[in-house]
Amino acid sequence: MADLQRFLQDRCLGVSNLPQKGRSLFTARDFRPGEVILSQKPYICVPNNTSSESRCDGCFKTNNLKKCSACQVVWYCGSSCQKSEWKLHRDECKALTRLEKEKRKFVTPTIRLMVRLYIKRNLQNEKVLPITTTDNYSLVEALVSHMSEIDEKQMLLYAQMANLVNLILQFPSVDLREIAENFSKFSCNAHSICDSELRPQGIGLFPLVSIINHSCSPNAVLVFEEQMAVVRAMDNISKDSEITISYIETAGSTLTRQKSLKEQYLFHCQCARCSNFGKPHDIEESAILEGYRCANEKCTGFLLRDPEEKGFVCQKCLLLRSKEEVKKLASDLKTVSEKAPTSPSAEDKQAAIELYKTIEKLQVKLYHSFSIPLMRTREKLLKMLMDVEIWREALNYCRLIVPVYQRVYPATHPLIGLQFYTQGKLEWLLGETKEAVSSLIKAFDILRISHGISTPFMKELSAKLEEARAEASYKQLALH
């Protein structure tokens, strides 16, 4: 671990042990917003292949794929990716080929990740693959597993998964309990590898990044450049500060966030935001994000439960909303929501759009205008409307979502930047060039912090902005 400390010191970082948190990453100098704090290639990674979509094992692209003729599990986009993956896939391929064809469909991305973990460990031990300071199995061994906190049901699932891995590998030296413990490590430490627009493409293990602890109001952000994990500062971070990222979706009440962290990561968050639990600001925030709207449609107040249990009282205009009215709306909403498809097929999109609009109307009557459920419905509608190329309506929804994002996320959160980017592209497409320039500038100002300025994604955004500016100038001149 001395090598690791030196590696981190060279990057003005250090690891300290904190009570309740364990290993934590600290700065040894000031970092400015947008500065890269740490980057790491995955120790192992696999794409999220499904029955409807496959990805290249090397680059995660989806175009022009060919299946490995031997194992029939892995896909490649060409010989370059196949060659780069061959040392690892050669042994994996043999192992998968031994498995009955019918059982290969049970090889999920997580199972493959575990198979690759042991194959890579063996290849590094045999010196077929190099061992480096940041790419070695000892970093995986140092990860926390939380095995003592796992319930019996989850332990049984890990045991079943470990049996399948053992059946695939057939390594005499591998212990089933160790495999189960590593599955627990995956649950707490593996990261979804996302594209520049934060869409999940695969999963990977980044042991250095896993040293970074969670906060619901983090000072850094994790993004991916292809499969490289890159951690950038979101704020000005002073020397000797702890680096934190968010492990979960932070839009939600303290109770919702705590529940999510406990279920997935098995810890109770004590960050600055969570320490406000039960205080007036936290109660207001929860009521806005997950509570009901005022009975007066023109009022923007939030509702709290009436002490006499008659309903909910608006904290702005003091109007009472009856329990019966809320219950009836919630029941109607539940009935309609149960009919809504999670991922409608292309031919069902129009019907799905109408159904989600009905859900939206009921949510507008029931929830606060900044509520998370309403925001999620509008996100779905935006995506579906863009899929069927109903651009004007898509733009309207985009404009409804942006203010909610600005309310629920920090100012430099990449999701706000990406939403402005979508808005700018839609405005430009619909001939609203001046508005498009404004939206694209806002997108660039946020995304340069999370994504840097030299990535292909940001170069494309920059080019679009320049083109839109030129078009706006031309239109302005044409008016004179």
From Swiss-Prot:
MF terms (GO), sorted A to Z: histone methyltransferase activity; zinc ion binding
Pfam families: SET (PF00856), zf-MYND (PF01753)
Keyword S-adenosyl-L-methionine: yes
Ranges annotated as MYND-type zinc finger: 56-93
This protein's GO CC annotations: chromosome; nucleus
Gene3D superfamilies: 1.10.220.160, 6.10.140.2220, SET domain, Tetratricopeptide repeat domain
Described function: Histone methyltransferase.
Protein name (record): Histone-lysine N-methyltransferase ASHR1
Designated gene of the protein: ASHR1
